[in-house]
Amino acid sequence: MRGPLCFTLIAIAVTSVVAHTTVYGVWINGVFQGDGRDVYIRSPPNNDPVKDITSSAMACNVNNSPVGTTLSVAGGDRFTFEWYHDNRDDDIIAASHLGPIAVYIAPTTSNGAGTVWTKIFEDVYNGTWATTRLISAHGQHTVVIPEVPAGDYLLRAEIAALHEAYSLYSQVPSKGTQFYISCAQIRVTSESASGSELSANTAFPGTYTDSTPGILWNVYDQDPTEYVAPGPDVWSGAPGGSISQVGSA
């Protein structure tokens, strides 16, 4: 006969299977750009997280290879990532996977290697976690394209799920913060205003370490208002962004 503990373990196992997420496509100024998987998104082969923060997969996940399409944008455009689990506009990510969302930018010529990334958006907790609001927004969150020099860039969206962040992956490989990462290829066609060079102060891997604030965190016991997301502050030249639905599937 199965007892309560057995059913609890089954529930945990099921949650771990159905919880994962990746980016399906993007919207530019409210217009959907079509299924972006392996088209303009450097899509991973599955929706599993990256947990080893020393891995090169921290840049653009495990399939960081150029794809055939680059999306044209201009400074000030609203660029919306749309995440999904198995099918577009499904459960997006498990409700238990609480954590922040960030977006970084780097020149495509770098392929994401080295200290080339600049954080241009971050949402952590404002009464509810960013991931909770992402589910309500049908997987959509927006970043405003900054006024940067014209050229090709990678836009890196990152979800850090903290439900197992009470242990470090380096010490307990079955646990650790789960990073869901996806990179889109963009071409900025507008010229920058003066003084808008990116800060380029972040490396993946490199910047996130076991001692970085936000990597080790007990989401069940600690005050969410005290949580500090990993990485630097958002770049001062970033115009902002939001977590809200811009369109329907």
UniProtKB/Swiss-Prot annotation:
| Free-text biotechnology note from the record | Lignocellulose is the most abundant polymeric composite on Earth and is a recalcitrant but promising renewable substrate for industrial biotechnology applications. Together with cellobiose dehydrogenases (CDHs) an enzymatic system capable of oxidative cellulose cleavage is formed, which increases the efficiency of cellulases and put LPMOs at focus of biofuel research.
The organism's place on the tree of life at top rank: Eukaryota
Q: Name one GO cellular component term.
A: extracellular region
Disulfide-bonded cysteines = C60-C183
Alphabetical UniProt keywords: Carbohydrate metabolism, Cellulose degradation, Copper, Disulfide bond, Metal-binding, Monooxygenase, Oxidoreductase, Polysaccharide degradation, Secreted, Signal
* Primary residence: secreted
**Residues noted as binding Cu(2+) in the record, renumbered to the chain:** H20, H97, Y180
Signal peptide region: 1-19
Q: How is the cofactor bound?
A: Binds 1 copper ion per subunit.
**GO molecular function ontology, one term from the record:** monooxygenase activity
Q: Which GO terms describe its biological process?
A: cellulose catabolic process
Q: Where in the cell is it found?
A: Secreted
Record flagged with keyword Ribosomal protein: no
List ligand-binding residues for O2.
H163
Q: EC annotation?
A: 1.14.99.56
Similarity comment: Belongs to the polysaccharide monooxygenase AA9 family.
PANTHER family reported for this sequence: ENDO-BETA-1,4-GLUCANASE D (PTHR33353:SF17), PUTATIVE (AFU_ORTHOLOGUE AFUA_1G12560)-RELATED (PTHR33353)
Function of this protein? Lytic polysaccharide monooxygenase (LPMO) that depolymerizes crystalline and amorphous polysaccharides via the oxidation of scissile alpha- or beta-(1-4)-glycosidic bonds, yielding C4 oxidation products. Catalysis by LPMOs requires the reduction of the active-site copper from Cu(II) to Cu(I) by a reducing agent and H(2)O(2) or O(2) as a cosubstrate. Active on cellulose and cello-oligosaccharides, as well as plant cell wall-derived hemicellulosic polysaccharides. Also active on cello-oligosaccharides such as cellohexaose, cellopentaose or cellotetraose.
Q: What is this protein called?
A: AA9 family lytic polysaccharide monooxygenase A
Its gene? Answer: AA9A
